[in-house]
């Protein structure tokens, strides 16, 4: 009885002719082992080809131009007839997909509105910068005018004060109160001012005012400590003569 091989085919007699599919007898290579070895060789070749295509970053290399990755149904990465190739990892891929989705889903009216808004904001910024420059220039001009008005008002006030001083020192007893306006020397004393006022009054004197002019030269302050002698009696006499001059 003939022996069976692993696939169930009867083995021929030793030295006999080849059987069935032309495989030799028991002394030749096993067909199953040859098939398994061929499959392992093909798988190893495919793995080696894919290994050479891996880039340094770990992402698969770019595929040939044509069908996008993932087959005909993968249209998310298509833009202008060409598919997007990932270059810098998943972040760029997600950003590109989001941008493509936005461009594909954004209506023309919204895109036009966004452009108009950009132009309007630029115009507003330019207008605000122009107004700011004008306001600064106007503020500088108004400040200069304010300083000019202040200086003019100060000069007028000084002139008015000088006129008021002259009018004040021309009235009676001005020599006792203070200096006259035409005194420029710092050592000009109150007595010298009173004497000058008395000399000026001589030409303008009228009858009956002699004792009044004399009283101007006297210090009627009872608390004065400059006097060494008691002159209260003389003071009272001069006051009475001032009030009731002697009749000649």
From Swiss-Prot:
Residues 100-162 are annotated as: Involved in binding clathrin heavy chain. The keyword Cell division applies. The modification N6-acetyllysine is found at residues 223, 242. It is found in: Cytoplasmic vesicle membrane; Membrane, Coated pit; Cytoplasm, Cytoskeleton, Spindle. InterPro entries: Clathrin_L-chain. The modification Phosphoserine is found at residues 105, 206, 236. GO terms for molecular function: clathrin heavy chain binding; GTPase binding; peptide binding; protein-containing complex binding; structural molecule activity. Residues 1-93 are annotated as: Disordered. Belongs to the clathrin light chain family. Clathrin is the major protein of the polyhedral coat of coated pits and vesicles. Acts as a component of the TACC3/ch-TOG/clathrin complex proposed to contribute to stabilization of kinetochore fibers of the mitotic spindle by acting as inter-microtubule bridge. This is Clathrin light chain A.
């Amino acid at each position: 009885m003939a022996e069976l091989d692993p696939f169930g085919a009867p083995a021929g007699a030793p030295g006999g002719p080849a059987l069935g599919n032309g495989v030799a007898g028991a002394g030749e290579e096993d067909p199953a082992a040859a098939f398994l070895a061929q499959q392992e060789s093909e798988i190893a070749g495919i793995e080696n080809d894919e290994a050479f295509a891996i880039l340094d970053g770990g992402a698969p290399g770019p595929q040939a131009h044509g069908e996008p990755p993932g087959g005909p149904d993968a249209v998310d990465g298509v833009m202008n007839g060409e598919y997007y190739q990932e270059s810098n990892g998943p972040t760029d891929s997600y950003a590109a997909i989001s941008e493509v989705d936005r461009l594909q889903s954004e209506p023309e009216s919204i895109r036009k509105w966004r452009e108009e808004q950009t132009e309007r904001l630029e115009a507003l910024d330019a207008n605000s910068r122009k107004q700011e420059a004008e306001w600064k220039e106007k503020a500088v001009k108004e400040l200069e005018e304010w300083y000019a008005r202040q200086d003019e008002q100060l000069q007028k006030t000084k002139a008015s004060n000088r006129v008021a001083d002259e009018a004040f020192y021309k009235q009676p007893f001005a020599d006792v109160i203070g200096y006259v306006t035409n005194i420029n020397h710092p050592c000009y004393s109150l007595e010298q001012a009173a004497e000058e006022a008395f000399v000026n009054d001589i030409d303008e004197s009228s009858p009956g005012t002699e004792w009044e002019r004399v009283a101007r030269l006297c210090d009627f302050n009872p608390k004065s400590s400059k006097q060494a002698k008691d002159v209260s009696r003389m003071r009272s006499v001069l006051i009475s003569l001032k009030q009731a001059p002697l009749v000649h």
